[in-house]
């Protein structure tokens, strides 16, 4: 299963789409940082958990879309045709699906880490502030539940009808 996981990670992470998505995410993250986190939220310091949470909350819809786009690699028409071949292998289909979902989770983690690294760079450069222990909990609480939900629900919707993933991408924007 490690070989399948590596192959799926390489397929997801070594393409032009990820580079474009990272570029858009980092540009948007920089804009959000300067517009939201830098002035502070509710008269708090820019490096307070409150301001950092507002920064991550604004980035969450874009990361949600990125997570679901990763799943579209596994639900495309080409993948459905290849599923006949993978079903004929002796590998357990559940373990194969778990390896693919884990690869998508690695891609989502990479997107989140890019946004967190940009914030760390800007906090260190602008304020000389590096106390990340106080912001780890807000990052985990804000990012983990919705993104795990996006991957799980997107996986189920994509197995039903692949086009439902694109409709599901609109959810965070409809809730704003």
Each predicted region: which residue ranges?
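Hydrophobic alpha-helical elements at and bordering transmembrane segments
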Residues: 5-9, 96-97, 136
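Aromatic- and glycine-rich beta-strand/loop motifs that create alpha-glucan
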Residues: 1-25
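Secretory targeting signals
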Residues: 27-74, 98-168
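Short helix-to-coil transition segments within interhelical loops
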Residues: 86-95
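Helix-terminus/helix-capping segments at the ends of transmembrane helices and short amphipathic helices
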Residues: 77, 86-87, 158
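Pore- or pathway-lining transmembrane helices of multi-pass membrane proteins that form conduits
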Residues: 19-25, 161-176
